[in-house]
Each structure stands twice: as C-alpha cells, then as structure tokens.
Amino acid sequence: MSQLSKKPSKQPLNQSLNQPEPPQQPSSKPSVGEFIKHEWRLLLVAVQFLTRLPVPQFANYNPQWLHQSSRHFPGVGLLVGLLCAGVFWLGSILFTPLVAAVISTAFGIKLTGAFHEDGLADSCDGLGGGLTRERTLEIMKDSRLGTYGVLGLVSALLIKISLLASMPLSVAIVALIIGHTASRLLCISLLTLLPYGGEIEHAKAKPMAQQLTPFQGLLSSAWLLLAGVLVVLLFPATVQQIGIWQWLLALLLGIVATDYMRRLLHRRLEGYTGDGLGATQQLSEIAIYIGLAASIPLI
C-alpha cells in the first residue's frame, strides 16, 4: 500500500469514556422517569462519541453505556443533519449551491471530527490492499493513509457535494436531514446482522463490539420516524414534490448500499468493524442522496 500521508492517532473524543466501571447495582425495573433519564443520558453519550459537541461530564460513568447508546446514533444523525441543513440554507443565501454544498459538507466533517470519513478511508485501504483477513485488519489499524483511502474519500466527498448542489434548495435540506438520520440507522443495523469481525482487544470502542437487541433497534427506528415527521411538518410541499416513488428509490438504494457492505464485511472480515460501520454510513448516505437527486420520468 502506497503511504501518502500520516493521520493523527485515533484517541477517544472525551476522556470520560475511559473512566473505570463502577460497581453494578441490583437490577430492578426502572420507573418511567428513570427510563427517560437513562435514555437522555445515553443520547448524550452518543453525541459525545460521534461528534465534537460539548456535553456534560458524567458521574460514575459506566462503559456499558457506550454500547447502549448505539440505539441513539440515528438521533445524533438527526442533530447533525439539522445543523448541516441550516448551514446549507445560510450558505445558499450568500453563495451558489455548489459553494453552499462545500461549506455544509465541511461543517459536517468538522462537527463529527471526520469520524465516519475516517472509517471509509481505512476501509478502502484495508479492503483494497489486504488479500487476507489478518492483513486487511492490520492495514485498517494503520494510522497512515494510503492510495485506496485517498481515492475513496475524495470520490465520496465529490459525489456528495455534487449531488447536494444539483438539488433544489428545499430538496437538499430535506435530503441532509433524512440522509444523516437514515444512514446511521442503516449503519447500526450491521450490529444486529453481523458479529464483530475485528480483534476485540484492538477494538476502538470495546463495548460497541456487541449486538443490538430488538428493543434497541425499535428505539433507533423511532429517530427516523421523528425525522420524517419533522420534514413533513416543515417542508410539506417539498415532500410531496419529491413523490412516493423517489422516496422509495432513495430508501431502496440506501438498503442496497448497506447490504453490499454487509456482504463485503462478512466475506472479507467475517463481521463488522468500527471502520466498516463508518464506511457503511458514508455509502448509504450517498445512496440516499442519489435516490433523491435522480430524475424519474413520469409514467
């Protein structure tokens, strides 16, 4: 693998994620108030893990919360999508759609610390340059960026920016909100569909190397439902303008991209990795944009 540049070593976004695990408390059925409080705390953990946004420090942090917080990753996607959509709208007032798309994409990268983009680049390097499972995992752990990673990352950014710039303003805003939310839901579906395929002792987030439960999957889906309700309330004309067939196409393409990554990771690594999840998020987000940007002739 041709080594082009060095990336900074991957460190936890907040050192509070490394605090020792407190003694376990006796299990008991929580009240509604306790349940809501716990889910809110998990949402903040998810925000802390996936973004650079400041969140309150946690007393008696439990590492298991990180795994549990994965059900709120689509909620973080909704937050990121809303913020990126706002930046795109502001940019479109002052600049051309292309410049607005560039600014919005750069803002999203800054907001998330290139978390998913890094996974895409590492996956391209590993899956492109590794002939065996062991060699692929070794390349993916390498902090240096190779040719496959550069080409994959640049291609993804160019496609994403071009698609957003080609859409009408309101459609691009809706696409950002739905795309960021749905892609993270599709991404974490691999936690249920695949076992962990990396070396558990080298996992970037060891508590994440576990499968989602059906209940967690249901809570994750609720975030996409909330995103859908928001865009219907805020942009009813745009939702109608896009049309049912185009919505179905976007959803289908997102599922196809996710299933492609599922098959690829299962064949090459016998399961998912953190980098593989990041690549899945990026590819499914782009696939959704393709569906919403496509011109479907009326039959």
Please tell me what each predicted stretch does.
Residues 118:
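Glycine/small-residue-rich loop that forms an oxyanion/phosphate-binding "nest" at active or ligand-binding sites
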Residues 2-113, 131, 142-299:
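Hydrophobic alpha-helical transmembrane segments
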